[in-house]
């Protein structure tokens, strides 16, 4: 059983946006695919997407688990219940997020999950970031699924009702920024910014892709392109390859930060990542 996993709630009505948020484009991916990929990188466990019954979803990373929200219009507690129930026996804890968080950083996810890893008695690690509680950028014990389901049946649909019945540790801005990686890579806590309106989306699209470091090895390192690391703007492995004039095909492997190996060009990148591209003769 994995220590942690991810849940993305994708079944919201997107009434303020006026269009389904899951499929909105952001730097070559969709909001939902990026969020799923970031959660997969940060947790190492399965990632569950909770959708409305019959909802169309954009293409998602392989091994994504998709479950239907059994009741329409019941809000986030219903999605939390469905997502946690899908992870029963598969993980001890899950980071739960909405679908519309393009700036969510793996360092933020790991910091929040670490609370549950270090304190068995804690049920929920709840960031209170940028002035607001963030129930859809928080970590929950999988064992809370029956409790959340009971609250839905009682029509007590706000996350605050769940928190009233749990041991909750709240993380304010200071506690989050005390983490060295968050301080360096997400100092403004942009991880919790979501995209609710067309204006939000326009602003999010105007932001540049994350700054990442790229380095080539083996045969790929020959010539000017291979002379040491370089910084590029890229939101996916494919974009990082394109920025160096590299074709990311079956002859090339990428290693993220020296450990996570991927051959999937859609793998999302975050600020501060280092992408090592390896050719076959370098062990790729």
Segment roles from a protein language model:
Residues 175-210:
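Glycine-rich phosphate/pyrophosphate-binding loop and the adjoining helix
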Residues 1-156, 164-189, 279, 283:
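Nucleotide and nucleotide-moiety/phosphate-recognizing core
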Residues 162-165, 197:
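A short, conserved alpha-helix in the catalytic core of glycosyltransferases
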Residues 202-283:
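Ubiquitin-like/PB1-type beta-grasp interaction modules and other compact soluble beta-rich domains
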């Amino acid at each position: 059983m994995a220590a942690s996993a991810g849940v993305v709630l994708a079944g919201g009505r997107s009434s303020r946006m006026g269009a389904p948020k899951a499929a909105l484009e952001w730097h070559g991916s969709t909001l939902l695919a990026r969020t799923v990929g970031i959660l997969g990188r940060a947790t190492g466990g399965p990632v569950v997407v909770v959708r409305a019954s019959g909802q169309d979803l954009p293409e998602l990373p392989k091994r994504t688990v998709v479950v239907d929200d059994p009741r329409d219009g019941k809000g986030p507690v219903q999605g939390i219940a469905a997502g946690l129930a899908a992870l029963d026996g598969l993980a001890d804890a899950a980071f739960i997020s909405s679908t519309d968080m393009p700036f969510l950083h793996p360092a933020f996810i790991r910091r929040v999950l670490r609370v549950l890893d270090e304190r068995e008695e804690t049920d929920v690690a709840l960031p209170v970031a940028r002035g607001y509680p963030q129930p859809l950028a928080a970590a929950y014990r999988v064992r809370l699924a029956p409790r959340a389901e009971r609250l839905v049946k009682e029509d007590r649909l706000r996350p605050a009702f769940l928190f009233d019945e749990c041991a909750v540790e709240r993380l304010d801005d200071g506690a989050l920024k005390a983490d060295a990686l968050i301080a360096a890579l997400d100092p403004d806590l942009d991880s919790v910014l979501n995209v609710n309106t067309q204006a939000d989306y326009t602003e999010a699209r105007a932001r540049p892709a994350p700054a990442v470091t790229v380095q080539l090895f083996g045969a790929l390192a020959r010539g000017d392109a291979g002379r040491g690391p370089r910084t590029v703007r890229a939101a996916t492995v494919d974009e990082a390859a394109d920025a160096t004039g590299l074709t990311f095909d079956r002859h090339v492997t990428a290693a993220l930060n020296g450990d996570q190996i991927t051959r999937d060009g859609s793998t999302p990148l975050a600020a501060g990542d280092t992408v090592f591209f390896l050719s076959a003769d370098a062990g790729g």
